Amino acid sequence: MKRAIIIGATSGIGEEVAKLLVQQGWHIGIAGRREEALEKLQATAPGQIVIQRLDVTDPDAPTLLETFIRKLGGMDLFFLSSGIGSQNPDLKPEIELNTTRTNVEGFTRMVTSAFNYFKTRGEGHIAAISSIAGTKGLGIAPAYSATKRFQNTYIEALAQLSRMQHLNIHFTDIRPGFVATDLLKSGKFPMLMQANQVAKSIVCALNRKKRVIVIDSRYRVVVFFWRMIPRWLWERLPIKN
């Protein structure tokens, strides 16, 4: 029996991934801040889903995760879908700091907890949703793009650490483009993808234990050309949504 814990499963990509894993026979633990949404999803497959209210910015979240793992009966896959982001060209401090609190502090808190759990087992799979926004610094969303770059680098560092310690821990860094979720409530975004379609690509990548996946093919082209742009030119480009 395969077991997964999904953090940030109350909506969007996390919720859709949870549904697909249940269809594939996984037993899953879903966690997030909105208990009502968790209960609604649990009702669709009560024999396969357990729930836990959890906020990644809470210092006690790792302790809750440990309890949740025991409640599920173990964990083979840790999937982190919790994150926030906003355009903030005016650099409002509360937006920048809230973004880093969730996407850096909360991310680090949960991923290190999962790593340490799998370290005791000697194996496991850690997957996290970052973004193509981590490819370059985005002037319209400084904290968001910077925190996503942090996530890319942190996962890379843990992958190296896992090998150094001779652990059989797999890592999947999921980098989608624009997805129609609660994060994109305002503004007009090009090439907008639906969460259920993105989730299908993610589950396929998880089953294959892919190290990095950019979703979808259009955004793979975008990222390819972004990487070719030199810094002096990038900083002069008026990047907008």
Regions found by a protein language model. Give the residues of each.
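Conserved glycine-rich cofactor-binding loop
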Residues: 10-11
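Rossmann-fold cofactor-recognition segment
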Residues: 45-60
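Conserved NAD(P)H cofactor-binding loop of Rossmann-fold oxidoreductase domains
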Residues: 81-87
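Short alpha-helical oligomerization interface
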Residues: 88-101
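Active-site helix of classical SDR
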Residues: 111, 147
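Residue(s) in the substrate-gating loop at a strand-loop-helix junction
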Residues: 131
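C-terminal helical subdomain
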Residues: 173, 185-223
